[in-house]
């Protein structure tokens, strides 16, 4: 693709394109942002039914995952206040953090979508083989009859790490064979965790988008393979969107008002864009124009920003404009956005901020030092959106801000210590600037 043709197709001005290619921290405000939910094939009823399905599975989940006993099989994370960071950054409204780093089973936001799609497939296979939704107990799915049935199938997915963990752990627990296709960005501890749970891992010396393509071909060759498509799955999206109903209940219990006068501004890390888009969509269903979603991406991997700003969405990769894709944010290391992100977020996403790796580590150090919150580096980038919000006139002083932490509790202690030693050092320097 020539530079002239590229510029014409991208419909981006020269300075904006130059800033992207020079890895500048920028903010893109979505010119199509609006409040009306269009008529889409994933809608309010889809998400309502997804929440009810997860409730039906709760007794089973409680019986197989000890970390869900407290919540009686509901896989959800807490919300907490961050008063020390609020003071440091002089945030006018309330500051909260959504602790998806503490999500049961796989310790990340991917527990929402990945586990949900595996459960959907398990339910489908069980029903086709005599399971009665109205009469049978979901705990019966632990029986040999169903485990042998599930073991005839292999579930496959491509992942940089966290989605692979959620799909692999849920699939293997039910009795499915699981194969996780991982790009070169995947970290060793995530690979080892999967292997320890009997999950097959294929590692590609290639980027995420090409790993997805390879995984898709692998699955198509096997009639007993079920492929979970991180670039286009509506079931994954629905699983992420269940967060909206849960967050509404949590905020109500905390007596936090969400309204046009007191909007909720949510800062979500974005890689391929599926999980933040699903969460944002679910929040929009609950709060409409009283919620303002903002994504945050690495300066070296602004895939959703490039896709949405250009209008090309899934049809363009950061590599097409010469961006190198090199980032320590392994969970966000995706060069091409999902097919769903641009479509469902076209008028639902307020904007996207980009963040340098150095600032990302500073925010991780900030969370550790000031709030004693331990997350993996990519889970901390929402703070960049929070800082950017001070320059956004549409966000009033009365807003409630929510940084969405996307992963961290599964990180081995020695790995986390290495992350945090570096992060706190960078934060100490960052703070004095």
Swiss-Prot record:
InterPro entries: D_Ser_am_lyase, Ser/Thr_Dehydratase, Ser/Thr_deHydtase_PyrdxlP-BS, TrpB-like_PALP, TrpB-like_PALP_sf
Pfam families registered for this protein in UniProt: PALP (PF00291)
GO MF term (any one): hydro-lyase activity
Disulfide partners: none
Record flagged with keyword Lyase: yes
Keywords, comma-separated and alphabetical: Lyase, Pyridoxal phosphate
Enzymatic reactions: D-serine = pyruvate + NH4(+)
Signal peptide bounds: none
Gene Ontology biological process: D-serine catabolic process; isoleucine biosynthetic process
Cofactor(s) of this protein: pyridoxal 5'-phosphate
Entry-linked CDD domains: D-Ser-dehyd (cd06447)
E.C. number(s) listed in UniProt: 4.3.1.18
Enzyme class at the top of the EC tree: lyase
PROSITE patterns xrefs: DEHYDRATASE_SER_THR (PS00165)
Residues modified to N6-(pyridoxal phosphate)lysine: 110
Similarity-based family: Belongs to the serine/threonine dehydratase family. DsdA subfamily.
NCBIfam families: D_Ser_am_lyase (TIGR02035), PRK02991.1 (NF002823)
Protein's name according to its UniProt entry: Probable D-serine dehydratase
